[in-house]
Amino acid sequence: MAQRGGARRPRGDRERLGSRLRALRPGREPRQSEPPAQRGPPPSGRPPARSTASGHDRPTRGAAAGARRPRMKKKTRRRSTRSEELTRSEELTLSEEATWSEEATQSEEATQGEEMNRSQEVTRDEESTRSEEVTREEMAAAGLTVTVTHSNEKHDLHVTSQQGSSEPVVQDLAQVVEEVIGVPQSFQKLIFKGKSLKEMETPLSALGIQDGCRVMLIGKKNSPQEEVELKKLKHLEKSVEKIADQLEELNKELTGIQQGFLPKDLQAEALCKLDRRVKATIEQFMKILEEIDTLILPENFKDSRLKRKGLVKKVQAFLAECDTVEQNICQETERLQSTNFALAE
C-alpha cells in the first residue's frame, strides 16, 4: 500500500481536494442550504396539484422544469413464455388434426366395411336365388325320385310335372302313387315329416321334398278286379279330353266367323262344315257314355264307381257345350241367309 499511493490520507482532509471535485453541469445551480421551516414538507407529503385541463390530481414531483421523472420498469413478457404458448397451440392443433384424420379414417373404413358386407349379402342372396332357380329347373326337367313307404313295402317312384307347372306338385305325386301302388287318390294320405300333404297344387320343393326323400302313404289298395275297371275308366277319360280339345277348336272358328274375320262369300260353306264337325263330336261323346254304361262295377268298387260318376258328369257338360255351339251355328247361318236374300232383292 505504501509503495502504490504512499501514506493514506485522512478522511477529513477534503479541503485539499477542491480541484478534484466534479464541476457542476450547465443549467444547474448549487443547492443552497435552507432551514427546514422554509423547505416545507417533503415531496411525498405535499398535496397533489390539479390539472387545469382535466381537473384530475397530478403529482407535483417532476413538474418543475428540468426535473427528472423516475424511470419505470416496463413489464415485458418473456420470449420463452410466448414460444411455449405457440408450441402448445401448435401441438394442440396437430393433435386435433390427427384426431380428426383418425376419426375420418375410421368412419371411411366403417363405411367401406358396411358396403362390403351389403355387397356380400346381396351376392349371397343372388347366388342362393340362382341355385334355387336352377334346382327348380332341374326338377322340372328331370323330375325327382321319392321313396314311398306303404305298410311294409317301399317303392321308389319317379315324379315329373304333368299338370303344366314348372315343377312337380303334390297332385303329380298322388297320381304316380295311384298308378304304381294302386291306392286311389281319394283314399290316399301322404305324410312327409309328420305333416299331411293336403294341398294338391303345392310344389314339392316348397314342402322340402327333394330327390331321395321319404314319404309315407296310408290307404287301402284296390282289388285286382277293380284295378282292371279303373284302367278302362282312365282310358275313357283320356279320350274325353281329346274330344274336348276338338270342341274348343270348333268354338274358336265360330267366334272368328261371327266377328267377320272370314269373307262373306266363304262364311256359308264354313258354317256348314262346322255344323257337321259339331255333330260328329256329339256322336263321339255319346259313344263314350255308352261305353261307360257297359261297365259293371260292384258296390265294393267304391273308387271305380266314384270315378265313373265324375266322368259321366264331365261328358254331359261337354255335350251341353256342343248343343250351344250347334245353336250358334244355326243362328249365324240364318242371319247370313237373310242378308243374302235381302241383297238379292
UniProtKB/Swiss-Prot annotation:
Residues 172-219 are annotated as: Interaction with HSPA8. The modification Phosphoserine is found at S223. Residues 96-137 are annotated as: 7 X 6 AA tandem repeat of E-E-X(4). Induction: Up-regulated during differentiation of bladder epithelial cells and down-regulated during differentiation of prostate epithelium. GO terms for molecular function: adenyl-nucleotide exchange factor activity; protein-folding chaperone binding; ubiquitin protein ligase binding. Keywords: Apoptosis, Chaperone, Cytoplasm, Nucleus, Phosphoprotein, Repeat, Ubl conjugation. Residues 81-91, 115-137 have a biased composition (Basic and acidic residues). GO terms for cellular component: cytoplasm; cytosol; membrane; nucleoplasm; nucleus. Ubiquitinated; mediated by SIAH1 or SIAH2 and leading to its subsequent proteasomal degradation. Residues 144-224 form the Ubiquitin-like domain. Transmembrane segments: none annotated. Residues 95-114 have a biased composition (Low complexity). Sequence repeats lie at residues 96-101, 102-107, 108-113, 114-119, 120-125, 126-131, 132-137. Residues 216-345 are annotated as: Interaction with PPP1R15A. Residues 68-80 have a biased composition (Basic residues). Homodimer. Forms a heteromeric complex with HSP70/HSC70. Binds to the ATPase domain of HSP/HSC70 chaperones. Isoform 1, isoform 3 and isoform 4 but not isoform 2 interact with HSPA8/HSC70. Interacts with NR3C1. Interacts with the N-terminal region of MAPRE2. Interacts with PPP1R15A. Interacts with BCL2 in an ATP-dependent manner. Isoform 2 does not interact with BCL2. Interacts with SIAH1. Interacts with HSPA8 (via NBD). Interacts with HSPA1A (via NBD) and HSPA1B (via NBD). Interacts with SIAH2. Co-chaperone for HSP70 and HSC70 chaperone proteins. Acts as a nucleotide-exchange factor (NEF) promoting the release of ADP from the HSP70 and HSC70 proteins thereby triggering client/substrate protein release. Nucleotide release is mediated via its binding to the nucleotide-binding domain (NBD) of HSPA8/HSC70 where as the substrate release is mediated via its binding to the substrate-binding domain (SBD) of HSPA8/HSC70. Inhibits the pro-apoptotic function of PPP1R15A, and has anti-apoptotic activity. Markedly increases the anti-cell death function of BCL2 induced by various stimuli. This is BAG family molecular chaperone regulator 1. It comes from Homo sapiens (Human).
